[in-house]
Design a protein with these regions (language model features):
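Catalytic loop of short-chain dehydrogenase/reductase
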Residues: 93-122, 129, 133-185
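A glycine-rich helix->loop->beta "capping" turn
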Residues: 53-58, 76-88, 96
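Rossmann-fold scaffold of SDR-type NAD(P)-dependent oxidoreductases
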Residues: 9, 84-93, 117, 142-144, ...
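Conserved Rossmann-fold cofactor-binding substructure of NAD(P)-dependent oxidoreductases
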Residues: 63-83
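N-terminal Rossmann NAD(P)H-binding glycine-rich loop of SDR-like oxidoreductase domains
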Residues: 9-12, 16-24
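Rossmann-fold cofactor-recognition segment
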Residues: 49-68
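C-terminal helical subdomain
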Residues: 189-190, 194, 202, 206-254
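Conserved glycine-rich Rossmann-like NAD(P)H-binding loop of the short-chain dehydrogenase/reductase
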Residues: 24-43
Length: 254
């Protein structure tokens, strides 16, 4: 039986881990998870995720700051007989060292955020495109953020009481959104969308919650990962491509 091949970056923790878990629970799914350290990821439980019949987890090394690693990962996949990708989820990201106003920003930190959150997904797409092209109904998903919406920026800034929102992270995700639109426009066979995964109970989300005086983030990583997978299932070129959605399917203005 044919498998559905899903590539997820940053699969060792957070929503990437939950997405890998969700897809592995489905029969006949090959889940390729990228991690910085394969041995560490296996020892931390990623290798112990239960897999449905015909499903398998394959780990590849991608250091997000390395723009060469995605191409090497694809070489490794092809050597293992994985020559087609049905879904690629660009998930790996960082928030930066601290949330500050633009006037107080650290240029090196900003450049690093952009490199990992926007440039690395470009390198990932360049590397995986030939494998996506071999799929009958290929899909590319950029894990974005609510703070990437330029249309909603002023309202969000007001809702946060005028506190800094982390301009580096927001700018990097807005750049990722623009990349997603370009991928959509340039590849008529692909279904391409950006998805805000929600305010999740991850390491990054918990730090953000404390910053804004919250006890914890409002959303469950496991529940929202299941919602994202449902959204990806429903996505078609005609209905979803070239658009930005919340995890539960509401369209977000760019």
């Amino acid at each position: 039986m044919s498998t559905t091949n899903v590539f997820i970056t940053g699969a060792n923790r957070g929503v990437g881990h939950a997405l890998a878990q969700t897809y592995l629970a489905r029969p006949n799914h090959i889940v390729i998870g990228s991690v910085r350290d394969i041995a560490a990821a296996r020892s931390n439980g990623l290798g112990d995720l239960p897999a449905a019949p015909g499903s398998e987890l394959v780990l590849v090394k991608i250091e997000s700051a390395s723009f060469a690693d995605p191409a090497q990962a694809v070489v490794e996949l092809e050597s293992r007989g994985i020559t087609r990708l049905d879904i690629v989820i660009a998930n790996a990201a960082i928030a930066g060292r601290k949330v500050v106003a633009a006037a107080e920003g650290d240029a090196e930190d900003f450049a690093n955020i952009l490199a990992i959150n926007a440039v690395a997904p470009m390198a990932l797409f360049a590397a995986t495109k030939p494998l996506l092209d071999r799929a009958a109904n290929p899909k590319w998903v950029s894990i974005s953020s609510a703070v990437a919406s330029l249309a909603n920026h002023d309202a969000m800034f007001t809702n946060m009481g005028g506190r800094p929102m982390g301009f580096g992270y927001g700018a990097s995700k807005a750049t990722l959104n623009h990349l997603s639109l370009n991928i959509h426009s340039e590849n008529p066979k692909l279904t391409v969308m950006a998805v805000d995964p929600g305010f999740l109970d991850t390491d990054m989300g918990n730090r953000g919650a404390k910053l804004f005086g919250m006890e914890k983030p409002p959303h469950s990583t496991v529940d929202n990962a299941k919602a994202i997978v449902k959204l990806v299932d429903a996505a078609t070129r005609g209905t979803h491509s070239g658009k930005f959605f919340t995890f539960d399917g509401d369209e977000v203005p760019w």
